A protein has these predicted regions:
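Condensing-enzyme catalytic core mediating Claisen C-C bond formation in acyl metabolism
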Residues: 1-29, 148, 234-300, 304, ...
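Conserved active-site "lid/cap" helical segment
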Residues: 2-78, 85, 172-181, 191, ...
Length: 404
């Protein structure tokens, strides 16, 4: 039997996160995915990139320019030799995190040595789709917006599990776990304040690759900062926003994540591959775990996935020096932290803001959590980090990393 091997993250970069219809709106999704890969290649010119065993990218949509295996398209567009294979994985919101976990697992098992993993999503460029007619001359064609949420709903799924919108699932979590509107708004404000402070200090420059983007009539533009944060947000301003999923309700545009565009990529290698290619290990991937919950409370998914991962690794929640939890909604972020025994305002949780401030490009977000955690461990001198996120239709994924 092959002995399990250590897996290392050796470098990690991302694009800025664009607003819906914002600065990255004119960048094709496959081109967007290629940008962080190309940046990694440029940062390591002495590496023989033909030795890559796999490029693994997460993507939640795959109905538009991200069709037909966007990982393969992206690696070719990035100039990686055509002999290198690529695969796209889809676990909706956790696709990018799962891509890293899948590649790490293959390295750990000895199937591969050297990989690039990450994720991409252009929610701006998500297309409308139309089902084919089931009979001649039908006038009942169904058209769906693929930006977010359900489409082409199976009636059995609807009857047995419900097809609540993402915001409605956030309301369900708020109700079931008694998360108040005031607590949600306070959580959202902390996200904005922390992201604003990080941006003002230039903290994200270490992980962001500037994007030369078509600018429409204005011509090309250079995008080098995240567009979504609103650092001037106030508690009073958040309190004025109306709930948009239910009335009465608690989920607002201010305490929910955004609809965004972005891409991220990391280099993964075994110890021997890192040495062979002159790469410096920065973090060890300890493991990944997934779990499932009822679709109507999908936001609580990080709780069982994190518990499963901790049990497997022999860790406790207090062992993590840094936690990056995806803020799909403040309600679910708070519910998860409370269930795991973490304070609402814990300084080591999303210390530079989360998805409420930075944005949530679905397939990219998990990879962003992982790379932000790697940089965060180095900044803090910490040892262990947890990246975790909920997943639409009721799942959770968690990944543990150790600074080296």
């Amino acid at each position: 039997m092959t002995e399990l091997r250590d897996v290392f993250i050796c470098d990690a970069v991302r694009t800025p996160i664009g607003r819906y219809g914002g600065a990255l709106a004119h960048v094709r999704t496959d081109d967007l995915a290629a940008i962080p890969i190309k940046a990694l290649v440029a940062r390591h010119p002495d590496v023989d990139w033909s030795a890559l065993d796999e490029v693994v990218l997460g993507c939640a949509n795959q109905a538009g320019e991200d069709n037909r295996n966007v990982a393969r398209m992206a690696l070719l567009l990035a100039g990686i030799p055509e002999s290198v294979p690529g695969i796209t994985v889809n676990r909706l919101c956790a696709s990018g995190l799962n891509a890293i976990g899948d590649a790490a697992r293959a390295i750990r098992c000895g199937e591969i040595d050297f990989a690039i993993a990450g994720g991409v999503e252009s929610m701006t460029r998500a297309p409308f789709v139309m089902a084919k007619a089931q009979e001649a001359f039908s006038r009942s064609a169904e058209i769906g917006d693929t930006t977010l949420g359900w489409r082409f709903i199976n009636p059995v799924i609807k009857a047995q599990y419900g097809v609540d919108s993402m915001a409605e699932t956030g309301e369900n979590v708020a109700q079931e776990y008694q998360v108040s509107r005031a607590d949600q708004d306070a959580f959202a404000l902390r996200s904005q304040e922390r992201a604003g402070k990080a941006m003002a200090s230039g903290y994200f420059a270490q992980e962001i690759v500037p994007v030369e983007a078509p600018g429409g009539k204005a011509g090309p533009i250079t995008v080098d900062k995240d567009e979504h944060p609103r650092p001037q947000t106030t508690l009073a301003g958040l309190a004025k926003l109306k709930p948009f999923a239910r009335n009465p309700g608690t989920i607002t545009a201010g305490n929910a994540s955004g609809i965004n565009d972005g891409a991220a990529a990391v280099i993964l290698a075994s110890a021997s591959a890192a040495e062979r290619h002159g790469l410096t290990p920065r973090a060890r991937v300890l493991g990944m775990a997934s779990a499932a919950v009822p679709p109507r409370v999908m936001g609580i998914g990080p709780v069982p996935s994190t518990r499963k991962l901790m049990e497997r690794l022999g860790l406790k929640i207090g062992d993590f020096d840094l936690i990056e939890i995806n803020e799909a909604f403040a309600s679910q972020g708070l519910a998860c932290l409370r269930q795991l025994g973490v304070r609402d305002d814990a300084e080591h949780v999303n210390p530079h803001g989360g998805a409420i401030a930075l944005g949530h490009p679905l397939g990219m977000s998990g990879a962003r959590l992982a790379l932000t955690a790697v940089h965060g461990l180095e900044e803090r001198g910490g040892k262990l980090a947890l990246a975790t996120m909920c997943v639409g239709v009721g799942q959770g994924v968690s990944l543990a990393m150790e600074r080296v």
